[in-house]
Amino acid sequence: MAAKEVVFGNDARVRMLAGVNILANAVKVTLGPKGRNVVLDKSFGSPLITKDGVSVAKEIELEDKFENMGAQMVKEVASKANDAAGDGTTTATVLAQAIVVEGLKAVAAGMNPMDLKRGIDKAVIAAVAELKALSQPCADSKAIAQVATISANSDESIGEIIATAMEKVGKEGVITVEEGQALENELDVVEGMQFDRGYLSPYFINKPETGSVELDHPFVLLVDKKISNIRELLPILEGLAKTGKPLLIVAEDVEGEALATLVVNNMRGIVKVAAVKAPGFGDRRKAMLQDVAILTGGTVIAEEIGLELEKATLEDLGTAKRVVITKDNTTIIDGNGEQTQIAARVSQIKQQVEESTSDYDKEKLQERMAKLAGGVAVIKVGAATEVEMKEKKARVEDALHATRAAVEEGVVPGGGVALVRVASKIAEVEVLNEDQKHGVVIALRAMEAPLRQIATNAGEEASVVANTVKNGSGNFGYNAGNDTYGDMLEMGILDPTKVTRCALQFAASIAGLMITTEAMVAEIPQNASQDMGGMGGMGGMGGMM
């Protein structure tokens, strides 16, 4: 086991603070509308230019082991904020630094670290309650666009495109971000349920100009097995021929005689029909067939629940307004299922998402939920160069997370104003002693740090801006974008409540623990030159006889 170096007391705290400051100072230059970018060197590819706090934090590793420990703990704050709310990583880092700096000063002055931490925790609990009281619901499209714009570094085009996407696919809908091919951002919306299975035979195509199958007001037959015998399908096909409506068959597979007969009937115009494979595999396929059944108001014909295909009637079939099938995808638009059953299915899947531990399973469940709830939107980010593309894509993803957080828990005035207002209301938190009281003061002072940093990054005097905002009331704050004061909500400067709450809670949690540090242990770095002993010289060979 390698030898360890142990440092105690003030020496430990000073070195830890140095690491905190290096990381936080690199991250906090990105805060606010006039925040700067940070360039990150990559071992392969071009350097990454970013204004995303957590991306900067993740790149930082320090040589000094003790400084690095401080930096890694603050990195954890940014990562936690990113995981929970998807945004607010820079705010969380600024708050953590402010609490650590003030807290370590108090410890150096002889105050009890544990009481300081308890005071900070009490202040944060009170602050979170006040934040929730200050929060307003974010319901309309305009507010969603404003939140997304602020999070995307005041880029209105990103705000608008996210608001439009949310409007089209609903709050439960899936919105994905991809790299586009054009210079401008584009939005593709797939309404209805789409799954990645195309037609089983090109002879089903009835729209040669687009190479697709389009069925208007079709019946939908869902079968959880392979169909190879046409006799099983005859009762359904005979019933359909009388109605004159088209049929979509979704089965594990349709092959041999059954597929050939369907193709012939379709080409002769006896029955308008198309067949596709069911999406997914195993249990996921069963679940997705059930989703389609609920969406279209049909029943899955499965032998394991005692239903046989030969005995199926038209009442077992689902219906939809329209179905479009291409070589690779099938889209069911406006299924005629009951809304109450669809809503129940969505809430059931939502429950599974919460219980699932696998990221892959969560993603697949959320996709299923979105397809039932409304559709899928794809934002294609446009840019002139690859470097700009990466930076812009990261901003769009941040804005999307912020918007989801805003819809979930509402919004508060942005620009650091919410925390300043909250701090003024919780000054009288109940404490047991003077040290705890000072812990509360540390937390209240730290709550001003984001506003001060936004002002500093905008080239203004932080104390002047902070005092002006503190002397105001309600939503009055500082708009760093155009250097004016006014009502933040009216100016459209909003922060999601969840983002602000998570930033404060995670910053206080980790910074509070750092204040209570009394000793640090790290491996002593070994120099390579010391590890390798020099090889002894070879003695000369004796003369040969």
Curated annotation (Swiss-Prot):
Its main location: cytoplasm. It comes from the Bacteria. Keywords: ATP-binding, Chaperone, Cytoplasm, Isomerase, Nucleotide-binding. ATP binds at residues 30-33, 51, 87-91, 415, 495. GO terms for molecular function: ATP binding; ATP-dependent protein folding chaperone; isomerase activity; unfolded protein binding. GO terms for cellular component: cytoplasm. Disulfide bonds: none annotated. Gene3D superfamilies: GroEL, GroEL-like equatorial domain, TCP-1-like chaperonin intermediate domain. It is found in: Cytoplasm. It catalyses: ATP + H2O + a folded polypeptide = ADP + phosphate + an unfolded polypeptide. GO terms for biological process: protein refolding. Together with its co-chaperonin GroES, plays an essential role in assisting protein folding. The GroEL-GroES system forms a nano-cage that allows encapsulation of the non-native substrate proteins and provides a physical environment optimized to promote and accelerate protein folding. This is Chaperonin GroEL. It comes from Shewanella baltica (strain OS155 / ATCC BAA-1091).
